[in-house]
């Protein structure tokens, strides 16, 4: 016997999407996902922001606001924001815009830069437009847009605690951006999830930023989760030239050398993962890590959170 049904498009009232325009940068697609309880009077929440929102927002949303999370998740309620690029601009535009936004000044004449140029030219030949060029150098402007324009504007519409301990997520070139922000004293973020950072890009920019920060500060109050895939390190020349593995271990070593009093790091080379497979696993592990709720790393905190969750369920059942 056939079952009758009337399918309808699934939607959620807790997910908004819109476009904004940043002077000197262009259009951005913004996704916002709200936690349960966001409409309670006086409620305020920290922000979890993913650059490359086209690629990473959905993953973060599932981990934080998906069905499993709403039933038995232990992560604290947060507002998830994705900052991405309009799909109608095409892949070549996406490729050069993110390269510009995520890096500081970089001539891109080195072998890695030339390889990125070659990929861009292939994308440009496929879908244009003809007047765009591959470039870098927009880190300061893009960070200023996030810090001074986007976050305050979002807080006028959504229940964001602007003084909260916000999280930044980035992958690949976005991971490079995360590390630049990590050592940026003006960054509005204090939790960082850095996935497969392109450590070999931009003429040692990460090393220079770290040294500059260390010369002027005696502490770094952050929670950092940094990782890459085991397969990214030694199985393919282009991936190896990006220095994903070197970025993870160098940052871990510098944290050990500097011994910042309030700097916390959790790092991992993830087995059986490559540059295209690591993201969801890394985001899930990273969110638990920077909130001190990762099993095997924060066992006491996990047990306490489990007990609190059980107690909350008991109260609701009475």
Regions found by a protein language model. Give the residues of each.
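Non-catalytic cap/lid and distal C-terminal segments of serine-dependent acyl enzymes
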Residues: 1-318
């Amino acid at each position: 016997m056939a079952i009758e049904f009337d399918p309808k498009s699934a939607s959620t009232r807790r997910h908004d999407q819109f476009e904004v325009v940043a002077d000197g940068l262009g259009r951005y697609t913004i996704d916002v996902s709200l936690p349960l309880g966001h409409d309670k009077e006086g409620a305020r929440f920290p922000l979890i922001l993913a650059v490359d929102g086209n690629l990473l927002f959905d993953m973060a949303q599932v981990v934080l606001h998906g069905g499993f999370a709403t039933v038995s998740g232990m992560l604290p309620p947060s507002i998830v924001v994705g900052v991405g690029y309009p799909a109608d601009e095409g892949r070549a535009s996406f490729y050069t815009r993110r390269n510009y936004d995520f890096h500081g000044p970089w001539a891109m004449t080195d072998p890695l830069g030339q390889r990125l140029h070659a990929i861009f030219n292939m994308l440009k030949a496929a879908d244009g437009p003809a007047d765009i060029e591959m470039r870098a150098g927009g880190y300061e402007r893009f960070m200023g847009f996030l810090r001074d324009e986007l976050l305050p504007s979002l807080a006028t519409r959504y229940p964001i605690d602007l003084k909260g301990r916000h999280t930044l997520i980035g992958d690949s070139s976005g991971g490079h951006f995360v590390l630049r922000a990590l050592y940026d004293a003006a960054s509005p973020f204090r939790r960082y999830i850095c996935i497969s950072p392109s450590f070999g890009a931009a003429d040692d920019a990460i090393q220079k930023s770290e040294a500059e920060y260390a010369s002027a500060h005696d502490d770094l109050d952050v929670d950092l989760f940094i990782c890459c895939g085991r397969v990214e390190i030694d199985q393919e020349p282009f991936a190896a030239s990006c220095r994903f593995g070197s970025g993870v271990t160098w940052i871990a070593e510098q944290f050990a050398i500097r011994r910042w009093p309030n700097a916390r790091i959790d790092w991992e080379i993830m087995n059986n993962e490559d540059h295209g497979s690591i993201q969801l696993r890394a985001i899930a592990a990273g969110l638990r890590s920077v909130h001190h709720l990762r099993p095997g790393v924060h066992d006491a905190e996990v047990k306490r959170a489990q007990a609190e969750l059980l107690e909350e369920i008991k109260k609701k059942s009475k």
